[in-house]
Amino acid sequence: MPKGEGKVVSQNKKANHDYFIEETYETGIVLQGTEIKSIRAGRVNLKDAFAKIERGEVFLHNMHISPYEQGNRYNHDPLRTRKLLMHRKQINKLIGLTKEQGYSLVPLKIYLKNGFAKVLLGLGKGKKKFDKREDLKRKDAKREIERAFRDRQKGLI
């Protein structure tokens, strides 16, 4: 199964707007019982989330998983730091890359694969304001071309 294939629960659309994503990694995530139930219900927000490498392990910060509605007083903390599961070789590679100026680890999406929650982690370099404007211009031009082509096709048929 290719990376990122499975039932997508949540996507971080802002990540592609703010970063040039150069590589992606599929990681497992350590969760508590009520957290996986909330994820399956789609109650996850990746908007402000980021990953950090601490003591040779990868941790995900600021990912909001809403408390499980049918949970009891032992429900989880919505913004707790969660450990990501990766191979040692991948972590060592990321340590070297994130030490370089401007590289960040950003969660792109969270999805369910074979019953397990997975996080697609992207290694990205921050975009400057002019890069974002350039991307918007490129998207608008592409949209205009597609619209003109579609209108032309309708006229010919």
From Swiss-Prot:
MF terms in GO: RNA binding
Any Pfam family: SmpB
Cellular location(s): Cytoplasm
GO-annotated biological processes: trans-translation
Superkingdom field: Bacteria
Primary residence: cytoplasm
PROSITE patterns: SSRP
GO cellular component, one term: cytosol
InterPro entries: SmpB (IPR023620), SsrA-bd_prot (IPR000037), SsrA-bd_prot_CS (IPR020081)
Keyword RNA-binding: yes
Protein keywords: Cytoplasm, RNA-binding
TM annotation in the entry: none
Function description: Required for rescue of stalled ribosomes mediated by trans-translation. Binds to transfer-messenger RNA (tmRNA), required for stable association of tmRNA with ribosomes. tmRNA and SmpB together mimic tRNA shape, replacing the anticodon stem-loop with SmpB. tmRNA is encoded by the ssrA gene; the 2 termini fold to resemble tRNA(Ala) and it encodes a 'tag peptide', a short internal open reading frame. During trans-translation Ala-aminoacylated tmRNA acts like a tRNA, entering the A-site of stalled ribosomes, displacing the stalled mRNA.
Family membership noted in the UniProt record: Belongs to the SmpB family.
Protein name: SsrA-binding protein
Record organism: Bacillus licheniformis (strain ATCC 14580 / DSM 13 / JCM 2505 / CCUG 7422 / NBRC 12200 / NCIMB 9375 / NCTC 10341 / NRRL NRS-1264 / Gibson 46)
